[in-house]
Amino acid sequence: MARVKRGNIARKRRNKILNLAKGFIGGNKNLFRTANQRVMKALCNAYRDRRRRKRDFRRLWISRINASARINGTNYSKLINGMKNAEIIINRKMLAQLALNDPKCFEKIVSSVSN
């Protein structure tokens, strides 16, 4: 039976991990075992944070909308409820952009909702 040599396969597997570990500090980029641990941790963090990013941005938009709504004499809850009743369909991202970049337009939306 022929002898099985796995040097190439093992090297490719290790190099794949070490390439993912580029930019890490110290032995975390050079030593396979620590690099492997760091890469696994980094991939777990990336997976978790891709989901967390969606929550964080929604929280940021709501905070911005609430701050601008309070400047205009209402609050976030009343503004969103009024928009639903008035059938004004603008998502929170766009509403936050309006509040930040075009306060006069945001003020018109608030006044149309509060009437």
Curated annotation (Swiss-Prot):
One of its GO terms (biological process) is ribosomal large subunit assembly. The keyword Cell membrane does not apply. SUPFAM superfamilies: Ribosomal protein L20. GO terms for cellular component: ribonucleoprotein complex; ribosome. One of its GO terms (molecular function) is rRNA binding. PROSITE patterns: RIBOSOMAL_L20. The keyword Ribosomal protein applies. It comes from the Bacteria. HAMAP family: Ribosomal_bL20. Belongs to the bacterial ribosomal protein bL20 family. This is Large ribosomal subunit protein bL20.
